[in-house]
Amino acid sequence: MKSDLWYFLLFCFQVEALTGEINDSTKSEMFTFHDGGVQILCKFNAIVSQYKMELLKGTEVLCDLTTTKENGNTVSKNPKFCQSQSSSDGVSFFLYNLDSSHASYYACQLSIFDPPPFQRKNISREYLNVYESQTCCQLKFWLPIGCAAFVVVYIFGCIFLCWLTKKKYRSSVHDPNSEYMFMAAVNTAKKPGLTGVTHNLELCGTQA
């Protein structure tokens, strides 16, 4: 049951890729959905032997990939945060576990080391809008309230149950038909007056 709830919360986060122009309704070529995350494709057609591709969120470098095509060596920065993969048409970065704080402009910055001269340029830049659905926002608002209400009701239920149990026990003790009633002590000693009366009756019978 708990796993189903977590899956539902994860699906509440919806990611929508938008271009830099607000009125542009064309499909984004930079962002695509991939295994619950977003694939950011940085395309370039230059023939280079060694280059570095950096993924920028605003002005912050999230991760980069350096490739030497002669040796086939690649070095990726921050592999835990984002994964990278080089291909014939460019470099792909994969971002996962996105939330609303990741909404920003993302840019691909290419640095060419070989062939010379050294060059650095931004080859693509688009805005990634990550928003939380209204259902998820309502759930995140009402879930703590519901949990708190459940705890309060549970505590009061336990208190009421204990009080009811004690009340039933006390009523069973004071009930005269209860098997737990204490038996009163009975005094079996004979009274002297009654004995005298008995003797007098015997004497009268003898005289007669």
UniProtKB/Swiss-Prot annotation:
InterPro entries: ICOS, Ig-like_fold, Ig_V-set. GO terms for molecular function: signaling receptor activity. The chain crosses the membrane at residues 141-161. Residues 1-19 form the signal peptide. It is a single-pass type I membrane protein. Stimulatory receptor expressed in activated or antigen-experienced T-cells that plays an important role in the immune response. Upon binding to its ligand ICOSL expressed on antigen presenting cells (APCs), delivers costimulatory signals that enhances all basic T-cell responses to a foreign antigen, namely proliferation, secretion of lymphokines including IL10, up-regulation of molecules that mediate cell-cell interaction, and effective help for antibody secretion by B-cells. This is Inducible T-cell costimulator.
